[in-house]
Amino acid sequence: MELSELKEWLDELYDRYDSPDFIENDPIAIPHSFSKQEDIELCGFLSATIAWGNRKMIVRNAFRLMERMDRAPFDFTCNASEQELNRLCDFTHRTFNGGDCIDFIRGLRHICRSYGSLGRFFETEYSANGDLRVVFSRFRTRFFEAEHRPHAEKHLSSIDRGAACKRLCMFLKWMVRNDSRGVDFGLWKTIPASALYLPLDIHTGNTARALGLLHRRQNDWRAVEEVTEALRQLDPLDPIKYDFALFGAGINGLLR
């Protein structure tokens, strides 16, 4: 398929799938239930953190987590007492357990107290160096400066170890992109959509390989860079708009 034909096809899929009609069973549905920016940011991060496995289970468990945080994730993160944090002890999503959840709240609290909010961390750090790869590394380092158990570290991928950082890339997409379609939020104005990286998983990876957008076999950070650079050839200003298009084509068997 010629590049122009591929772009036309992916643009059609983007128009089909990048719509509020398709987000009911997507993890982005949970932060859409909030209106305050700081709540959207923290809910979005925690929802993205548990975004693996069955999508309906992800959404259900993320809503359960928000209920335990009194549907006020920013206030809970910054101000919850130890007794209130213990409400999270029996929360589980697959291998993400209650102890991990509490450790993540501690990490987020450390970030929010240091920078004022989660968004201010990412915007401040991006403004300082202009490279999301550096920001991802800095975020993980600062996040785990807070007290935590080693088990929690497995749930925040390390770009320094070559991980694809799918959930962090997805969270950044939600916060940065603004296409006025009511899907992504576009809250962080100082980070351009052109700087984002594709949230790479088995579905988007296999679809990208089938389309010739990705040749690397492993779904690691080098693959993320390769496929993102290919998508920038299709749309330099907003390459990650094709995320839903690749995902939808993969799970709906459009390449068969």
What are these regions (language model features)?
Residues 1-256:
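HhH-family (HhH-GPD) DNA N-glycosylase catalytic core used in base-excision repair
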